[in-house]
């Protein structure tokens, strides 16, 4: 039997998957990783932990299937984008990875805006200068960690780094360059002028490769550490949200995917690059397609924060009932009416990326009274993410992008309550892929297509199928429209206060 290995370098875990070539998922395994925030608005991860996770996952997957490593025909890697990893002359990371939702470089964003006209930037990149862009983070490093920055020989992203550790051959994938703000969409290829604006020379970026292109082969050293066979082909991977959209079945014009992870991704498939400064544009895994997309900096991570900081008693009650805290709180909040008893939450716990591009925005809860309970806050948080997705969908419609099917995936999609709220707020049916294997499957599939082991992009439908369709309930529509209007108005009213809050002393 030949199989394909997919690896996903995620925010909270590293995931591995083995699939066969007939639509079968042979095994999955994961190891925890940790987002570290040493200071306000910082988001970092340990690249060494990612690699050690990979070295543990491969033997686990092989052991659980009884397969030998020689059965693995190819490897693909996906991950968060655009993270920032600095390597020295020896290829060793100089510091922890700076994550895509890191919002430290507020001043540098404004500095960069002063160096290049925003319209010129948009014409080149199809996007705007925002907290996702890599250049401000590199400018921050040059200013605040000059010794480290001065030693940097190579800059790359998360899945590119693991690919490099496997093959010894450095490269960057197209979507890292595009979301980093270094890719000229009009001309095709890296824009050296934009790279220089970040304070680095273009030779600090490895060669650019498209998803599915050969990236090299597993080295003897990597084979010894991971248990893979030396010489196993490694294929250039892809951004995790794009892999996830592909696995969800978004392979046709106007397919919309909402991804309920730690962050909240929303992705619309198109046959041409439809751009807007408020949104991001990416290459689809399938050649010739594009993905107009947005990302809420925090969605599921807000729920995790509520459980960790406010829900200790509820967590104990959930354990006693044999439930997860999230499922228990869903049950408690399910009988509340739309609007969470008069509470509206803005989920800007890490600032906000699209469509606001405001790293100074803060998480906000409005409407609290002494009669409110944690279940009200919980429902307000669920509704806030749905409102955030509705905001993005409104922008897509302003861009003259038609929205067809709505597909929901990732961990948060397991919540029936959250899915029903989302269908009601979007006023559209939501198709859930409950058994969605995640981005790792997309990476494995790309590995198969890149090596010729697989030959049909549409065959992804054999691996992931719709679990349930949530129909919008018209009786809730008006109430949600009212609450959504308040949600949108709240940010406009508070926007001028957020910078003042940011200037207060940090804990």
Summary of predicted features, one role per range:
Residues 64-100, 125-134, 163-184, 207-210, ...:
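Short beta-strand-loop/turn "lid" adjacent to the catalytic site in phosphate-handling enzymes
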Residues 5-6, 106, 113-126, 133-171, ...:
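Active-site core segments that coordinate phosphate-bearing ligands/cofactors
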Residues 206-214, 319-326:
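Short linear loop/turn motifs
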Residues 68-71, 201-204, 402:
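Short loop/turn motifs at secondary-structure junctions
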């Amino acid at each position: 039997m030949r199989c394909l290995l997919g690896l996903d370098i995620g925010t909270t875990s590293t995931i591995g998957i083995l699939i066969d070539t007939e639509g079968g998922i042979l095994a999955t395994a994961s190891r925890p990783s940790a987002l570290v925030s040493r200071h306000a608005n910082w988001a970092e991860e340990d690249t060494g932990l990612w690699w050690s996770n990979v070295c543990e996952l491969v033997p686990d997957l092989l052991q659980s299937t009884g397969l030998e490593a020689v059965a693995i025909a190819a490897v693909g890697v996906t991950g968060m984008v655009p993270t920032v990893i600095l390597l020295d002359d020896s290829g060793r990371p100089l510091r922890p990875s700076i994550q895509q939702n890191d919002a430290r470089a507020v001043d540098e964003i404004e500095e960069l805006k002063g160096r290049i006209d925003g319209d010129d930037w948009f014409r080149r990149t199809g996007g705007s200068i925002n907290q996702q862009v890599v250049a401000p983070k590199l400018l921050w490093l040059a200013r605040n960690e000059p010794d480290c920055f001065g030693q940097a020989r190579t800059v790359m992203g998360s899945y590119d780094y693991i690919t490099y550790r496997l093959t010894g051959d450095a490269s960057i994938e197209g979507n890292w360059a595009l979301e980093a703000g270094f890719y000229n969409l009009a001309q095709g290829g890296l824009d050296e002028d934009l790279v220089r604006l970040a304070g680095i020379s273009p030779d600090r970026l490895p060669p650019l490769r498209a998803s599915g292109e050969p990236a090299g082969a597993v080295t003897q050293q990597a084979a010894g550490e991971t248990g893979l066979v030396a010489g196993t082909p490694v294929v250039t991977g892809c951004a995790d949200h794009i892999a996830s959209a592909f696995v969800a079945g978004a392979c046709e014009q106007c397919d919309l995917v909402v991804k309920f992870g730690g962050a909240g991704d929303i992705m619309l498939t198109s046959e041409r690059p439809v751009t807007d400064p408020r949104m991001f544009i990416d290459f689809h895994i399938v050649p010739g397609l594009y993905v107009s997309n947005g990302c809420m900096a925090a969605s599921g991570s807000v729920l995790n924060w509520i459980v960790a900081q406010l829900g200790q008693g509820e967590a104990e009650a959930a354990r006693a009932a044999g439930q997860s805290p999230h499922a228990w709180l869903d049950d408690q909040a399910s009988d509340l009416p739309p609007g969470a008893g008069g509470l509206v939450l803005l989920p800007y716990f890490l600032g906000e990326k699209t469509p606001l591009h405001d790293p100074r925005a803060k998480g906000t809860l409005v409407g609290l009274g002494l009669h409110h309970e944690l279940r009200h806050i919980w429902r307000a948080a669920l509704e806030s993410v749905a409102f955030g997705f509705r905001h993005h969908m409104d922008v897509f419609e302003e861009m003259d992008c038609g929205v067809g099917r709505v597909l929901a995936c990732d961990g948060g999609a397991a919540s029936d309550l959250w899915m029903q709220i989302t269908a009601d707020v979007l006023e559209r049916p939501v198709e859930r892929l409950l058994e969605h294997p995640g981005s790792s499957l997309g990476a494995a599939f790309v590995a198969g297509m890149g090596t010729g082991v697989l030959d049909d992009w549409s065959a992804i439908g054999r691996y992931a199928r719709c679990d349930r369709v949530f129909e919008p309930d018209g009786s809730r529509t008006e109430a949600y429209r009212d609450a959504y209007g308040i949600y949108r108005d709240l940010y406009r009213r508070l926007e001028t206060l957020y910078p003042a809050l940011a200037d207060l002393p940090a804990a």
